[in-house]
C-alpha cells in the first residue's frame, strides 16, 4: 500500500501583494493540495502545519522596483511569526539599473510541529513590489 503524499503548492499572482518592501506574502491560488498534513486558505499568508514532521519547503519570490537606482531585496521563512534566521536568502545589490527585477529561490528542510504557521516574508527597505511567488511544501518524514 502506497503512503499518502502530503503536498501543498500555493501561488501568488499579480495583485495579491500590494504592500511594498517588508511584508509577508499572500497566496491567492492553491495549485495542489494533497493529504491532510498541510492547509492554506486562498488569499492568506498563512500555511498551516496539521501534522508534526520534517518538511521540505521550496519557494520562488519575484521582486520588482519602479525606476532606475539601487535595488535589493531578501526573503526569509517565518514559523509562528518568528524569523528562522538560517533561511534568510539575500539578493544581490544592483546599482543604477533600469530593469529592476529579480527572483529569489530557495529550498530548505525544517522540522515543524502540529499547529505551526509557516509564512514567506519579503524583506527590503526599498519600495519592492512582490508581483509573483510560489511556495511548495511537502512532508517528507
Residue spans of the language-model regions?
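Extracellular jelly-roll beta-sandwich "head" domains, especially the C-terminal globular C1q domain
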Residues: 1-141
